[in-house]
């Protein structure tokens, strides 16, 4: 009898652990971690000090806001997620979480993220967080994603706002510095996402999402990636020229940008297995992380105390 009870208890524990893991996956933890990092850099570059406790609240609110948007995105996109190999193991597709539960979780999480940002930080940061969640869900997920080949470009606004939120949380303003942080991510998003679309082209065709390669073709997409990569190279150097970062930043950011351009150019000589597209996609993640790490470590602005 005791062994049976023990087995039942173990099953409950395993189920609870599985449920927690599924809810974490529902919030897109990889996206959350990148969003939290860029939000932190935005805070770090603001020319004011902030109490570490408030900094933790800001990062928690930004992360939960991103998780909220991710959860509602999975709720809305569960039909097409089931058609794509890349997303077939998501919690709603597997039936691990019910759609109503996912929607409720996303709405509640988003509410508390915005509420505590307003209560503990300031209204500007709270409004920007609310706008980011709204934009990702309503403008990108519901309106653009299934209708426009510019879905990633226009929809990229939401992904580029976290450092602006972080900056506003500390300074209660939007400045040229935070706008440049926004532009770096905004211009980075299309080549990053279109590189993914190149080697997931069949998936997007199956679910009829109008990504650039499926609508305009592979060659046109590669040309657009190269154009945006050139723009990214130029914008990434702006922090030095406005006195935001030092000469070390200029040198290293320039080198990172040249490598980005190399990978973008190599797409025109890609093999049928899309090896170069996969390399560009992987490098683009490293690039954004390292650029923002560089922005914080070579800053000429006094920051968090």
Curated annotation (Swiss-Prot):
<keyword id="KW-0350">Heme biosynthesis</keyword>
<dbReference type="Pfam" id="PF01040">
    <property type="entry name" value="UbiA"/>
</dbReference>
<feature type="transmembrane region" description="Helical">
    <location>
        <begin position="123"/>
        <end position="145"/>
    </location>
</feature>
<keyword id="KW-1133">Transmembrane helix</keyword>
<feature type="transmembrane region" description="Helical">
    <location>
        <begin position="281"/>
        <end position="301"/>
    </location>
</feature>
<feature type="transmembrane region" description="Helical">
    <location>
        <begin position="218"/>
        <end position="238"/>
    </location>
</feature>
<keyword id="KW-0997">Cell inner membrane</keyword>
<dbReference type="InterPro" id="IPR044878">
    <property type="entry name" value="UbiA_sf"/>
</dbReference>
<dbReference type="InterPro" id="IPR006369">
    <property type="entry name" value="Protohaem_IX_farnesylTrfase"/>
</dbReference>
<feature type="transmembrane region" description="Helical">
    <location>
        <begin position="52"/>
        <end position="72"/>
    </location>
</feature>
<comment type="pathway">
    <text>Porphyrin-containing compound metabolism; heme O biosynthesis; heme O from protoheme: step 1/1.</text>
</comment>
<dbReference type="InterPro" id="IPR030470">
    <property type="entry name" value="UbiA_prenylTrfase_CS"/>
</dbReference>
<dbReference type="GO" id="GO:0008495">
    <property type="term" value="F:protoheme IX farnesyltransferase activity"/>
</dbReference>
<keyword id="KW-0808">Transferase</keyword>
<feature type="transmembrane region" description="Helical">
    <location>
        <begin position="240"/>
        <end position="260"/>
    </location>
</feature>
<feature type="transmembrane region" description="Helical">
    <location>
        <begin position="102"/>
        <end position="119"/>
    </location>
</feature>
<dbReference type="GO" id="GO:0005886">
    <property type="term" value="C:plasma membrane"/>
</dbReference>
<keyword id="KW-0472">Membrane</keyword>
<feature type="transmembrane region" description="Helical">
    <location>
        <begin position="31"/>
        <end position="51"/>
    </location>
</feature>
<protein>
    <recommendedName>
        <fullName>Protoheme IX farnesyltransferase</fullName>
        <ecNumber>2.5.1.141</ecNumber>
    </recommendedName>
</protein>
<comment type="similarity">
    <text>Belongs to the UbiA prenyltransferase family. Protoheme IX farnesyltransferase subfamily.</text>
</comment>
<feature type="transmembrane region" description="Helical">
    <location>
        <begin position="179"/>
        <end position="199"/>
    </location>
</feature>
<comment type="function">
    <text>Converts heme B (protoheme IX) to heme O by substitution of the vinyl group on carbon 2 of heme B porphyrin ring with a hydroxyethyl farnesyl side group.</text>
</comment>
<dbReference type="InterPro" id="IPR000537">
    <property type="entry name" value="UbiA_prenyltransferase"/>
</dbReference>
<dbReference type="GO" id="GO:0048034">
    <property type="term" value="P:heme O biosynthetic process"/>
</dbReference>
<keyword id="KW-0812">Transmembrane</keyword>
<feature type="transmembrane region" description="Helical">
    <location>
        <begin position="151"/>
        <end position="171"/>
    </location>
</feature>
<keyword id="KW-1003">Cell membrane</keyword>
